[in-house]
Amino acid sequence: MEKQRLKAQLSSLRVPLFSVPWPGQCSNKAEVIEARMMKWADEHNLLVTDEYRNRVIRTRYGLLAARCYPNAGEVLLQAIADYLVWFFLADDLFVDRVEVATDETIRNLTAMVDVLDLNVAGSPPVFGELAWLDVCQRLRRLLQAEAFERFAQGMRLWATTAALQILNHLRPTPVGIREYQTIRRHTSGLNPCTSLADAANKGSVQACEFYDADVQTLVRQTNNIVCWANDIQSLRIEIHQPGQFRNMVTIYAQQGQSLQDAVETTATRVNKEIAGFCELADAVTARPISDELHGLIDGLEYWIRGYLDWVVHDTMRYADQFIESDADDRRFSAPDLSLLKKNCSSVTESTSSLV
């Protein structure tokens, strides 16, 4: 009933555009990175059917990496692009575009945590686990130990707060906005992404600067801007998902607003976060800070602008013409046993990489 009421309002929905006061950038290696990313996804059997392959091609995850990390070295940028394609596929197939909870949900998510904790894959590995191990091993080699742990902690929180998201969707009514914001902050997967922003620019920030209260506020504002803007931009397709479909917009609508008013309320909050980010970033960079911290703040700006530009110029992930085919992944959620065996036998823990 909740979904049907929301779907009835989609045809007249107006989606706002967002702007930020700094220019976008993009790595000149974007197309090379995209092509290698597709090859890597093929080698790790992540593209379960031709239909799924075509979806990934038109989504352009490599372009997202190139826009959000324009100054990254080629090897690091490739690892990030491969991570992004893996993450979006895993998030869709394990959490978002399948039933709210399945027999495999806990096994899939705990396997992702075990790769981070143990640096090995299970036997047999779950779908995508060996690809995830490859990404993690490459990032371990490329990052300082503490910097990798920031990334790893973000991913652990993604996997564990997915359970809170599942509980929210098992309820007859959604949680409140405050609770949703907590869940969204971590299930988005953005914290692992922003944890790489310094290394992709001027090198890893020391812990004393990274965990400074103002710096963490900037990280959180970046997360809020991207996630809440995405709640608007992905609204049409998420309402058609079989499992996870509640977001900030739908919660405001559940509280009595029309869907259009809920979009506008969310957009106002995004713009307020952008203004707050700009003010605080100016204040922090006016202080005597390290080059690495300057690079991190630049990297947060790249992520905000890069994501917004990716949605407008590159990706068809949220395109209306693909909603019916892309919103429901239940037919892909349990790849047949022969494919899973192929995955396990053809890719080993010592998967080759660019490093």
Swiss-Prot record:
It catalyses: (2E,6E)-farnesyl diphosphate + H2O = (+)-corvol ether B + diphosphate; (2E,6E)-farnesyl diphosphate + H2O = (+)-corvol ether A + diphosphate. Gene3D superfamilies: Farnesyl Diphosphate Synthase (1.10.600.10). Binds 3 Mg(2+) ions per subunit. GO terms for molecular function: metal ion binding; terpene synthase activity. Mg(2+) 2 binds at residue 96. Its EC number is 4.2.3.163, 4.2.3.171. SUPFAM superfamilies: Terpenoid synthases. The record marks 92 as: Plays a critical role for substrate recognition. It is an enzyme of class 4 (lyase). One of its GO terms (biological process) is isoprenoid biosynthetic process. The record marks 88 as: Plays a critical role in the stabilization of intermediate cation. Mg(2+) 3 binds at residues 230, 234, 238. Its cofactor is Mg(2+). Keywords: Lyase, Magnesium, Metal-binding. A motif (DDXXXD motif) lies at residues 91-96. Signal peptide: none annotated. Substrate binds at residue 184. Mg(2+) 1 binds at residues 91, 96. Terpene synthase that catalyzes the conversion of (2E,6E)-farnesyl diphosphate (FPP) into sesquiterpenes which are important for fungi-environment interactions. Produces a mixture consisting of 8 sesquiterpenes including corvol ethers A and B, as well as traces of epizonarene, gamma-cadinene, delta-cadinene, alpha-cadinene, alpha-cadinol, and an unidentified sesquiterpene. The major product is corvol ether A. Belongs to the terpene synthase family. The Asp-Asp-Xaa-Xaa-Xaa-Asp (DDXXXD) motif is important for the catalytic activity, presumably through binding to Mg(2+). This is Sesquiterpene synthase MAJ_08936. It comes from Metarhizium majus (strain ARSEF 297).
